[in-house]
Amino acid sequence: MRRLTVVQLLPALDAGGVERSTLEIAEALVDAGHRAVVVSAGGRLLPRLEALGAEHRALDIGRKSPLVLRHVRTLRTLFREVDADIVHARSRLPAWLGWWALRGMGGKRPHFITTAHGLNSPSRYSAIMARGERVVCVSRTVRDHLLAHYPATDPSRLVVIPRGIDPAAFPRMPHPDRAARARIAGMHPQLEGEGPLLLLPGRGTRLKGHTDAIALLAALRGAGTDARLWMPGMVQAGREAYVRELVEMTRRASIEDAVAMTE
């Protein structure tokens, strides 16, 4: 088996499905004997990435500024330095930078792959996610979205690989873990109780369905069920206005003492 070098491009390594998928692919590559290189601005998941045996190159390729164009040459140099076989872009701006870097390489160039993790607003800027030699779509909905808005895309290049979870990290239990519930309630008193605990992990974006979860909780509590709602991952820099909006929604529904929004 020939050892491959795969370079993944993304803005940062803080939290979210893109970041988790990046770590999972890096781990799979290393376990299979390949070389995994990740380019990002870094973040709290960086120690976990490096513990997997992957390499990280710090480069702020997600900052929306004209100055980011200077990273095209840096990426081109990096691709040559590591002798990249595959460049895998997971976000729009990093994808554009990687695309431009590859276009300036003479001779044999690395293959260019993208993963469309969501339903980006249709535009020339977003179209880069459909330009990969192979485009990984995390759902059939994402595949249909790309084909509908970028009809020139060859459907044979799109591959649906649904996102999933590691069952070892999220094991099924025959009954609720009361000790775990008590620990969580100790950190977030709003979650204390014996009733159902609703969990909605995800970044603070409207696509995640936070308002629907709050409406569901309000209906359950209105029907007499002592349900609680935990939304981890949504409290992030730049999401403050959205969080305030949701807090106000819980207040209007008189359920603010049964909801925890956390990092």
Residue ranges of model-derived segments:
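Short His-centered aromatic/hydrophobic patch
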Residues: 88-95, 116
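Glycosyltransferase donor-sugar binding loop
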Residues: 39-44, 201, 228-244
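N-terminal strand-loop element at the rim of the active site
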Residues: 8-73, 157, 234
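Carbohydrate-associated surface elements
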Residues: 141, 164
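A conserved mid-protein helix/loop that constitutes part of the nucleotide-sugar donor-binding site
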Residues: 16-27, 196, 200-225, 244
